Amino acid sequence: MDANGIKLTPKDIVSKLDEYIVGQDDAKRKVAIALRNRYRRSLLDEETKQEIAPKNILMIGPTGVGKTEIARRMAKVVGAPFIKVEATKFTEVGYVGRDVESMVRDLVDVAVRLVKDQKKGLVKDEAVNKANEKLVKLLVPSMKKKASNNSNPLESLLGGAIPNFGNNDDEEEETPTEEIKTKRSEIKKQLLDGKLEEEKVRIKVEQDPGALGMLGTNQNQQMQDMMNQLMPKRKVEREVPVKTARKILADDFADELIDQETANQEALELAEQMGIIFIDEIDKVATNNANSGQDVSRQGVQRDILPILEGSMIQTKYGTVNTEHMLFIGAGAFHVSKPSDLIPELQGRFPIRVELESLTVDDFYRILTEPKLSLIKQYEALLQTEEVTVNFTKEAITRLAEMAYQVNQDTDNIGARRLHTILEKMLEDLSFEAPSMPNAVVDITPQYVDDKLKSISTNKDLSAFIL
């Protein structure tokens, strides 16, 4: 968790969101207040802190207007664990498919990665040093003592090829001779000077365990987690370049240097206190007809989500986590249904409502120009790698914005995602030919845009399929 990020004022948070997201000021203000309230809560005494629950947010707006991006960027600002799920992927408890508790387990997995990555960063130098020492031994090996022949009691059960418990890559080696010591010293100097990066070495790496395919998705995952914890890790030999081996070995050594149990406990606390779960397409499980079978199933999913929003103890492979103080953000277009079609108990769990506006021509223009790494800057950077300089005129950008808006009006409104499609189609020929035109300078003008796109954008049938 970013200690500086959580102390940001609402104005600071909105300012950071403005670097990446255009418009939607009301939504930005509300998520900024929700984040600041978490910081305020952390300053209170324990008794008061337990009474204050986060105010969950319901975002209402068509696709492509920034609902997911606002939540994702908000989580990055404070370094909070964030997970996006789709309400339509869940099934009622007892049916085959993902149950709603899986989103909490996924959030904890994200929190564990965040905490461990942070802790690995603190021991990175030591881990790299250990990796370099190991590489020197691999590049200049000495005689190794005979390994123990004790068999693994699980070997016959799992078809062999399981290493003994307690064994690792570093087999005990005999005391190196003076000649080997001298050679290792020379190799170490070359290694640190970066002269051996492409040399091949053989290292042992953990092999991903095979998936269990005979159960439903959720039961499968739980069984897989349990088996992974019980069984020792399979290791296989791979031949890789030194630079790749260093990364793999340094990561393994970093894992050994950090206290795994402490990291897991910190991750559970981080998920509980700072976790953000974004539930997309929540409008698809809303229903205004409780009589049909499909609608009954949707209500079942809503009722399964409800106790998690209220606060439940969920069992994960790292321990039990309490969802009471997690922040939940529901989102949906609500074209067919409306928020009042959600069951009343669930409506009450999303006290903050924010309606996001459809994008205008001006919004599209700003999306193309204002963000820190706008789409146009991305394409310019990509083509610059081929030594092709692309210059977009203001008039061309305006034309692209108008075209994106018009295609959205004439076909399905997919918001800002339409710009990706239009830019990709417009620059398709240039991207293909770029390697054969070094040092070229291409000016993107309104005429260029029209030449590439006008015949398609003005034909509703073509634009529906191509743009």
Curated annotation (Swiss-Prot):
GO molecular function list: ATP binding; ATP hydrolysis activity; peptidase activity; proteasome-activating activity
Compartments reported by the entry: Cytoplasm
Residues reported in the UniProt entry to bind ATP: 22, 64-69, 280, 345, 417
Location of region: Disordered: 146-185
Positions with biased composition (Acidic residues): 168-177
An example Gene Ontology CC term for this record: HslUV protease complex
SUPFAM superfamilies in alphabetical order: P-loop containing nucleoside triphosphate hydrolases
TM ranges: none
First-listed, main subcellular location of the protein, grouped into a coarse class: cytoplasm
One Pfam short name: ClpB_D2-small
Keywords tagged on the record: ATP-binding, Chaperone, Cytoplasm, Nucleotide-binding, Stress response
SMART domains: AAA, ClpB_D2-small
Gene3D superfamilies documented for this protein: 1.10.8.60, DNA helicase RuvA subunit, C-terminal domain, P-loop containing nucleotide triphosphate hydrolases
InterPro entries registered for this protein in UniProt: AAA+_ATPase, ATP-dep_Clp_protease_ClpX, ATPase_AAA_core, Clp_ATPase_C, HslU, P-loop_NTPase
GO BP terms in the entry: protein unfolding; proteolysis involved in protein catabolic process
Family recorded in the similarity comment: Belongs to the ClpX chaperone family. HslU subfamily.
Function: ATPase subunit of a proteasome-like degradation complex; this subunit has chaperone activity. The binding of ATP and its subsequent hydrolysis by HslU are essential for unfolding of protein substrates subsequently hydrolyzed by HslV. HslU recognizes the N-terminal part of its protein substrates and unfolds these before they are guided to HslV for hydrolysis.
HAMAP family assigned: HslU
PANTHER family documented for this protein: ATP-DEPENDENT CLP PROTEASE ATP-BINDING SUBUNIT CLPX-LIKE, MITOCHONDRIAL-RELATED, ATP-DEPENDENT PROTEASE ATPASE SUBUNIT HSLU
NCBIfam families found in the cross-reference section: hslU, PRK05201.1
The protein's assembly and partners: A double ring-shaped homohexamer of HslV is capped on each side by a ring-shaped HslU homohexamer. The assembly of the HslU/HslV complex is dependent on binding of ATP.
Listed name of the protein: ATP-dependent protease ATPase subunit HslU
Source organism (scientific name): Staphylococcus haemolyticus (strain JCSC1435)
